[in-house]
């Protein structure tokens, strides 16, 4: 049966190496590894069975990054916690378990456990003791410590290399605020603690695209979407909006425009929350509040009333030519990313 959430992007991370660090109780045979490889077929994806003891795991990872020289490191849960400490690389920490010792205690991880995925050494089970829990508490105390020795310039550079992604339905770890106290690039995605195809495609892939664009110094044409085109009379996304938005972000830099209502701060917050709820991670930091659309530099403006002084091409949403988002999709498909 065809999976509607898996789509391949051979042009993204082409010829590059992606390193994946798995979560607690998992292995390099995790389905996430094959999911990444399937999505980015021209990239090389590497992963390693991480030792149970955290100091050994970090030693292995520090050895491996020198060996494989990854262009991007992605870590999930425990792997996200380790990934934060691999300074100097572009990396994504997904639901990072920065309070691993407490998480183990809260979720009854003490005692005999079963490896969730096949390990290269053939082990099927392992034992979590109080001593091991203490080891994880100690390793998490090292998180963020490397930032303290950096100069302001080095810190700013390092912070631009790291993304934290947090599932809004994660009931296992809750480290968004802790992460945000050290790194500015933190976003939510719709999903639970464990990634599935949908949360990976909608939450992680857009960030990988941004990172690849930055690495390649790739400038995509800019599309502005005015918020007057987004919602129906009930406040829900208009028909085919999600389809159009997901198509556009694959080829363009897409920004949401909303009026800068100085006397209505609550509306500013409501507009941002709507975008996060319905457009999710791709809209993160891609909302522009402005009352002067003619001052914006861009290629396309989709608006119910496009500003005649906008320097690019205006598409009048709701007109006979662009009555619905389906007509907008057809227009941009014909352009082919131009």
Give the location of each predicted region.
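Active-site catalytic motif of lipid deacylating hydrolases and related acyltransferases
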Residues: 5-67
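Asp-based phosphoryl-transfer active-site loop
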Residues: 216-235
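C-terminal cap/substrate-recognition subdomain and adjoining C-terminal extension
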Residues: 265-338
């Amino acid at each position: 049966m065809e999976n509607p959430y898996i789509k391949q992007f051979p042009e993204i991370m082409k010829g590059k190496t992606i390193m994946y660090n798995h979560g607690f109780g998992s292995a390099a045979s995790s389905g996430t590894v094959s999911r990444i490889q399937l999505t980015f077929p021209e990239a090389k994806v590497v992963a390693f069975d991480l030792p149970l003891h955290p100091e050994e795991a970090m030693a292995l990872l520090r050895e491996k990054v020198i060996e494989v020289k990854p262009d991007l490191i992605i870590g999930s849960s425990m792997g996200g916690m380790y990934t934060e400490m691999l300074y100097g690389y572009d990396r994504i920490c997904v639901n990072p378990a920065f309070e691993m010792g407490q998480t183990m205690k809260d979720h009854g991880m003490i005692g005999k456990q079963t490896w969730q995925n096949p390990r290269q050494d053939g082990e099927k089970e392992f034992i979590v003791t109080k001593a091991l829990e203490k080891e994880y508490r100690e390793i998490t105390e090292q998180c963020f410590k490397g930032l303290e020795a950096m100069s302001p310039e080095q810190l700013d550079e390092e912070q631009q290399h790291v993304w934290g992604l947090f599932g809004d339905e994660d009931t296992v770890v809750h480290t968004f605020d802790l992460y945000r106290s050290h790194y500015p690039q933190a976003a939510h995605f719709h999903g639970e603690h464990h990634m599935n195809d949908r949360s990976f495609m909608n939450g992680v892939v857009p960030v990988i695209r941004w990172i690849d664009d930055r690495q390649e110094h790739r400038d995509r044409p800019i599309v502005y979407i005015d918020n007057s085109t987004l919602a129906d009379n009930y406040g829900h996304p208009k028909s085919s909006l999600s389809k159009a938005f997901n198509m556009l972000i694959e080829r363009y830099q897409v920004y949401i425009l909303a009026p800068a209502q100085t006397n209505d701060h609550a509306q500013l917050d409501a507009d941002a929350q709507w975008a996060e709820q319905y457009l999710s991670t791709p809209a993160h930091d891609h909302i522009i509040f402005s009352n002067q659309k003619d001052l914006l530099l861009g290629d396309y403006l989709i608006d119910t009333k496009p500003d005649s002084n906008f320097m690019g091409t205006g598409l009048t949403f709701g007109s006979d030519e662009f009555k619905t988002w389906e007509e907008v999709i057809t227009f941009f498909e014909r352009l082919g990313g131009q």
